[in-house]
Regions:
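Helix N-cap motif at beta-to-alpha junctions
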Residues: 36-38, 86-92
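Short amphipathic alpha-helical segments
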Residues: 38-65, 100-105
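N-terminal signal peptide c-region/cleavage motif recognized by signal peptidases
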Residues: 17-18
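Bacterial N-terminal signal peptides that target proteins for export
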Residues: 1-8
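Hydrophobic helical h-region of N-terminal Sec-dependent signal peptides
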Residues: 9-13
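Short, flexible helix/strand-to-coil boundary loops that buttress conserved ligand/catalytic motifs
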Residues: 97
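Macromolecular interaction modules
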Residues: 23-24, 84, 94
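Glycine-rich beta-strand-turn "strand-cap" elements at beta-sheet edges
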Residues: 22-26, 32, 61-79, 104-126
Length: 126
């Protein structure tokens, strides 16, 4: 009888361990700057976007970076900037993503740049 309890507990731990050790979600958008918009305008707009996006459910503590190429080869997509967003958990990301597409925040990203693709990554501390 003790073996059954031990096996059940060990099985539950094995099933739950991927969730306990899950890293943080990071989404990266590949974007083109619209026309002759300056980098400073893109950064200012990214700040406005972050403030509005952080107010959505799951957005608390969200981190946002704008990445500009310094020395690169062509990526084939004409990417001028990458918008990188990280959340504290996949639960927070899920809440945020459920609210984002229908929100006014989604329109803000189009004021200075047009994003043509994104990928969701899992980050792990080294």
């Amino acid at each position: 009888m003790k073996n059954k309890g031990f096996i059940a507990a060990a099985s539950a731990l094995m099933l739950m361990s991927p969730f306990a050790s899950a890293g943080n979600p990071v989404q990266m958008w590949k974007c083109n700057i619209n026309g002759d918009v300056a980098e400073e305008a893109v950064m200012a707009q990214a700040g406005k976007w972050k403030a509005a996006a952080s107010a959505l459910p799951g957005g608390e503590g969200m981190m946002v970076w704008s990445l500009y190429p310094v020395a690169v080869g062509a990526d084939g997509d004409g990417t001028d900037v990458k918008l990188v967003v990280a959340w504290s958990s996949f639960t927070a990301y899920g809440q945020w993503w459920d609210a984002y597409p229908a929100s006014d925040v989604a329109q803000l990203e189009r004021e200075t740049m047009t994003c043509h693709g994104s990928a969701l990554w899992e980050s792990e501390d080294a």
